[in-house]
Amino acid sequence: MKDYTVPLTLISILADAEFHSGEQLGERLGMSRAAINKHIQTLRDWGIDVFTVPGKGYSLPEPIQLLDEEQIARQIEHGRVTVLPVIDSTNQYLMDRLGELQSGDVCVAEYQQAGRGRRGRKWFSPFGSNLYLSMYWRLEQGPAAAIGLSLVIGIVIAEVLQSLGADKVRVKWPNDLYL
């Protein structure tokens, strides 16, 4: 498994949307400015818009709030939550652990490198821009009970978001939500 410690540390530093010089970042992470620049490119590859201003350093266009596993876990009544900053696919993560899962177990990620939709179609999942999650639920009635479930869940989540003030949220068939 690849080590993402440096890019993730850079994201946590830059999350305040203030400028941080390459020199400061290098000192903090114990590496050269050139190495910092290489890791900044990784952030860009992940879909993060990083401003580079000579003489000022690096900055994000606006602050970002990263996922907090403890805070999310407090909100989950049934099952366990796993929050991973970088993952191939939340769905694949659960599929690889089917024998260990309980109904209600959730996998949430900041970034998916190989997110998949219906019929295995891949899509780009920029870091920290959307909510990437999969939930495992054992259906006692079998797979036939899941027909239409994806659409119903999308509609319910859209209604909850609307009640919280996200008036422009819309459902795209079958379960994508857009704000």
Regions from the PLM with identified roles:
Residues 167-179:
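Catalytic palm active-site di-aspartate
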Residues 2-162:
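N-terminal lobe of the biotin/lipoate ligase/transferase fold
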